[in-house]
Amino acid sequence: MKTFVAKPETVKRDWYVVDATGKTLGRLATELARRLRGKHKAEYTPHVDTGDYIVVINAEKVAVTGNKETDKLYYWHTGYVGGIKQATFKEMIARRPEAVIEIAVKGMLPKGPLGRAMFRKLKVYAGSEHNHAAQQPQVLDI
């Protein structure tokens, strides 16, 4: 008997919607990354994108534990000399709440072309409205 290897054209991808209200950021991101990779499926193959599409709503209501709301810092660079910027978790939630979940999940995915393809299947929205109703996403309770 040979080892099963999934083929990209035969992978069945489902759509799921996840409500981030009150969920802990790291625990939520871990499960999202796992499902984007497809590790929850029996047909998981490391070099093939077998994951599902995931729509995250209410990203602005995601929670962190302890003092991370004020102590956790996000850094980025503008590209100019001396252009290093930083913002706390609280400031990031106020400015761009989707980025908090996107950054957390992106760090948990493989680096390279396959990881970027997996990341493109993650859709994050700050509010409760999303524009993927045509895909009929199933509610996923994490």
UniProtKB/Swiss-Prot annotation:
Annotated GO MF terms: mRNA binding; structural constituent of ribosome
- GO terms, biological process: negative regulation of translation; translation
Against Pfam families, the record matches this protein to: Ribosomal_L13 (PF00572)
What does the UniProt keyword field contain? Ribonucleoprotein, Ribosomal protein
For the keyword Cell cycle, the answer is no
The cross-references to Gene3D superfamilies, in alphabetical order and at most eight, read:
Ribosomal protein L13
GO CC: one term? cytosolic large ribosomal subunit
Q: Which InterPro entries match?
A: Ribosomal_uL13 (IPR005822), Ribosomal_uL13_bac-type (IPR005823), Ribosomal_uL13_CS (IPR023563), Ribosomal_uL13_sf (IPR036899)
Its biological purpose is as follows: This protein is one of the early assembly proteins of the 50S ribosomal subunit, although it is not seen to bind rRNA by itself. It is important during the early stages of 50S assembly.
The family classification in the record reads: Belongs to the universal ribosomal protein uL13 family.
NCBIfam families listed in its UniProt record: rplM_bact
Q: Summarize subunit and interaction data from the UniProt record for this chain.
A: Part of the 50S ribosomal subunit.
Output this protein's name.
Answer: Large ribosomal subunit protein uL13
